[in-house]
UniProtKB/Swiss-Prot annotation:
Protein name listed in UniProt: Lysine--tRNA ligase
Taxonomy of the source species: Bacteria, Pseudomonadati, Pseudomonadota, Gammaproteobacteria, Moraxellales
Subunit note: Homodimer.
Source species of the chain: Acinetobacter baylyi (strain ATCC 33305 / BD413 / ADP1)
HAMAP family recorded: Lys_tRNA_synth_class2
Enzyme class: ligase
Length: 509
């Protein structure tokens, strides 16, 4: 049935404060009556037995004549009043909406008066039997009714609704009440997380939980949030990645592990970045980065089919194909492909790339930047946004991949990939560096970069080096940004659209 707008024709055009005052007056009347009857103003004894969407599905193929010609089907529903026209109402629960038919001849006068006084947003319980209108709409013929929660603030209506984007983010609860599209987005998010968890569990991965506060920030190149532990009198860092702890677990014998949890990076906010975000990280012993590319293809294709029913996923004006295999190309070749004036010699020439970075890209080149760092900058600035269809970029420079295993044929690159869709990085994975001596040297190089002014360079983690010295089996690991993946599946333009409560600048009180 067509879903009515959140709109009332019975309420006069009053200010919000006037409407709130009216509702408080109604609550006072309810409280006064409750004192006489001994009933609770906020009852909590009703037990719902049916959901709106389940009833719509159950009776979708049963016409009016069949419903009226058979034994009555009695139901008990509950939800928020979204429309009240006197003779019928519409309530909304977590699954959808259903009409309630108000039989003026069959209900007591005081019940009819209470129904008439209901405001949009009130939460009610209803009992009755199923019927179908002449227009074909399914309804519950009301026989019993109870007000469960009195709403003291008016809902946005059709013309003055919750259209301000910032208001949607600040008052997500209200956005969820009035916008079906918003509810659908977060249902998709839940399906994505559940689908990933089920896929990996079926592959014999074990879900684990690792610390959210770290003594040393590690596992990624980013600025951390800093806090203080009063009892231990020491600085701690909100984690930027769980990687080093998860690899410790592989050392300990848990050969397939994953964690779905929050990471925190004290960096900028944009349509693609939020300082607090959700990641899935997983590690598999006796596998390499190519195995994880295959796993990623299989998992994303299954998610698309299970959630959307297709591997052709619309996003804005584009359609992304989640049907594997996905394109795979090295960073070196991708730079050449998208910079036709470059030669292979140019891409391997530090001085050429430094001049291009400064003069064309207008990016600062610090003295410590090596060839790999400059290649990465050129790739990020000239290639990334052009990677529209699902694409694996492979063979990242060792200089910018301090935790990845060096390639056997070329020690200047690593067995690493990043995965892109719509010009955005969604995943990062690689064959893990399990040589503790090489890892220690790379940590030392990162410390030198940090001392030279690179705030995102990594710290030296002696405990992790000690763990590697006990022996990490050949392992591959990967992280996928849940928020960005949900953006694609939900066709959401901003990362804030897929976060229930995104961080906002504090308003003046």
């Amino acid at each position: 049935m067509a879903q009515p707008n959140v709109q009332s024709t019975s309420e006069p055009i009053l200010s919000e404060n006037d409407l709130i005052a009216q509702r408080h007056a109604k609550l006072k009347q309810i409280q006064d009556k409750a004192k006489e009857t001994g009933k609770s103003v906020w009852p909590n004894t009703f037990k719902r037995e049916h959901y709106a969407a389940d009833l719509q599905e159950q009776f979708k193929d049963i016409d009016k004549a069949q419903i009226e010609g058979s034994d009555k089907t009695y139901v008990k529903v509950a939800g928020r009043v979204m429309l009240n026209r006197g003779s019928f109402m519409v309530i909304q629960d977590m699954t959808g909406r259903i009409q309630l038919y108000v039989d003026r001849k069959g209900l007591p006068a005081d019940t009819l008066e209470t129904i008439k006084s209901l405001d949009l947003g009130d939460i009610i319980a209803a009992e009755g039997y199923i019927g179908r209108s002449g227009k074909g709409d399914l309804y519950v013929h009301l026989e019993g009714f109870e007000l469960l929660t009195k709403s003291l603030r008016p809902l946005p209506d059709k013309f003055h609704g919750l259209t301000d984007t910032e208001a949607k983010y600040r008052k997500r609860y209200l956005d969820l009440i009035v916008n079906e599209e918003t509810r659908k987005t977060f249902e998709i998010r839940a399906q994505v997380v559940a689908g990933i968890r089920a896929f990996l569990t079926n592959q014999r991965f074990m879900e684990v939980e690792t610390p959210m506060m770290h003594v040393i920030p590690g596992g990624a190149s980013a600025q951390p949030f800093v806090t203080h532990h009063n009892a231990l009198d020491m600085e701690l860092y909100l984690r930027i990645a769980p990687e080093l702890y998860l690899k410790r677990l592989v050392v300990g014998g848990f050969e397939r592990v994953f964690e779905i949890n929050r990471n925190f990076r004290n960096e900028g906010v944009s349509t693609r970045h939020n300082p607090e975000f959700t990641m899935i990280e997983f590690y598999q012993a006796y596998a390499d980065y190519k195995d994880l590319m295959q796993l990623t293809e299989n998992m994303l294709e299954k998610l698309a089919l299970d959630i959307l029913g297709t591997t052709d996923v619309p996003y804005g004006d584009e359609v992304y194909s989640f049907k594997g295999p996905f394109k795979k190309i090295s960073m070196f070749d991708a730079i050449l492909e998208h910079n036709p004036d470059f030669t292979p010699e140019n891409v391997n020439d530090r001085e050429f790339l430094a001049k291009f970075t400064q003069d064309v890209l207008k990016e600062q080149v610090k003295p410590g930047f090596g060839l790999g760092k400059l290649q990465t900058i050129v790739f990020e600035e000239t290639v990334e946004t052009k990677l529209r269809q699902p694409t694996f970029i492979t063979e990242y420079p060792a200089e910018t991949s301090p935790l990845a295993r060096r390639n056997d044929d070329n020690p200047h690159i690593t067995d690493r990939f990043e995965f892109f869709i719509g010009g955005r990085e969604l995943a990062n994975g690689f064959s893990e560096l399990n040589d503790p001596i090489d890892q220690a040297e790379r940590f030392q190089a990162q410390v030198a970069e940090k001392d030279a002014g690179d705030d995102e360079a990594m710290h030296y983690d002696a405990d992790f080096i000690e763990a590697l010295e006990y022996g990490l089996p050949p392992t591959a690991g990967q992280g996928i940004g849940i928020d960005r993946l949900v953006m694609i599946f939900a066709n959401a333009p901003s990362i804030r659209d897929v976060l229930l409560f995104p961080h906002m600048r504090r308003k003046d009180v």
